[in-house]
């Protein structure tokens, strides 16, 4: 397994709209190995902000990123949220189209459900989509926020909404652990341990101490609470250190900045340097043990 440090693209609203190609070049200059774009299943960009890529913008980005040596191993698919979802057939068609254009293997979805109805709806949908696309070498992956960690009652028992989702989704739908939201709603170390057999990628997100005080909701979280990895309260380094016990982990460590008061790319660069340093320290320790 080769570790790759990347960034999600959805938070780079202003940067991509102002200078799309320049922002891709800056991502490479920072030293990132990969990106995870947010894809809209539509041919033309039109008036859609450029942090959400159409097929045509994906083609343009793929060509430039190939030249820069930056890969696209995963993509977040804009297929709906909460109770709204695109039809299964449209999602499947879109994934296969993207796979043909860019060769992406991992397709990430977020439903943001907190109850059994939403968990069941998204679980059934992604179970079916996974069955459609697995023969083509594509993996369907779920990305958590905070809602999915809520406990729901079923008879005399309780379980987390994410567990309910996976009962419907089946064994082939994997997890992209957003450790920041896991920490915000539950415990990032416990989440990584509990779902280690599902995790294929991780989103490295950090929050300031005040964000964890119970004062904020995800929707009301101000930009000042989103800090570079290692500057906040989330145990990002410790969770990264657990990846070797995750049998399906593919090496992708995706920086999830989302908002910033200091500058998105500047914060992403800090996070990249910090994670790279941790990995180098870990490799040095391993080498010393081997000697």
State what each model feature region is.
Residues 7, 34-35, 133-233:
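Acidic/histidine-rich catalytic cores of soluble enzymes
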Residues 1-105, 197, 273, 277-291:
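N-terminal pre-domain/capping segments
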Residues 8-12, 38-42, 77-82, 111-114, ...:
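Active-site beta-loop-alpha junctions enriched in small/polar residues
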Residues 229-245, 251-256:
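H/E-rich (His + Asp/Glu) clusters that bind or coordinate divalent metals
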Residues 3-9, 35-37, 72-77, 107-109, ...:
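Hydrophobic faces of well-ordered beta-strands that scaffold small-molecule active sites
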Residues 254-269:
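A short, acidic, flexible beta-alpha connecting loop/helix-capping segment that sits on the rim
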Residues 23-25, 58-62, 92-96, 123-130, ...:
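Generic structural signal for well-ordered alpha-helices
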Residues 34, 64-71, 81-174, 265, ...:
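Active-site acidic/histidine proton-transfer and metal-coordination neighborhood
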């Amino acid at each position: 397994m080769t570790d790759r440090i990347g960034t999600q693209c959805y938070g780079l609203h202003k940067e991509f709209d102002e200078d799309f190609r320049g922002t891709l070049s800056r991502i490479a200059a920072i030293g990132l190995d990969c990106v995870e774009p947010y894809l809209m299943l539509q041919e033309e960009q039109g008036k859609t902000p450029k942090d959400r890529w159409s097929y045509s913008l994906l083609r343009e980005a793929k060509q430039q990123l190939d030249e820069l040596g930056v890969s696209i191993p995963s993509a977040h698919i804009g297929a709906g949220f909460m109770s709204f979802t695109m039809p299964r057939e449209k999602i499947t068609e879109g994934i296969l189209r993207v796979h043909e254009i860019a060769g992406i293997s991992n397709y990430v979805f977020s439903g943001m459900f907190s109850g059994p109805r939403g968990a069941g709806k998204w679980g059934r949908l992604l179970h079916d989509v996974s069955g459609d696309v697995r023969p083509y070498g594509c993996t369907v992956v779920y990305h958590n926020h905070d809602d999915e960690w809520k406990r729901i009652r079923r008879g005399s028992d309780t379980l987390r909404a994410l567990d309910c989702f996976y009962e419907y989704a089946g064994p082939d739908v994997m997890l992209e652990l957003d450790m920041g939201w896991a920490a915000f709603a539950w415990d990032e170390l416990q989440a990584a341990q509990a779902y280690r057999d599902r995790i294929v990628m991780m989103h490295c997100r950090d929050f300031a101490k005040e964000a964890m005080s119970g004062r904020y909701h995800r929707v009301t979280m101000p930009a000042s609470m989103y800090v570079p990895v290692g500057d906040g309260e989330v145990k990002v380094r410790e969770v990264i250190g657990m990846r070797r016990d995750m049998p399906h982990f593919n090496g992708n460590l995706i920086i999830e900045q989302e908002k910033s008061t200091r500058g998105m790319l500047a914060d992403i660069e800090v996070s990249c340097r910090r994670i790279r340093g941790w990995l180098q320290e870990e490799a040095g320790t391993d080498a010393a043990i081997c000697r």
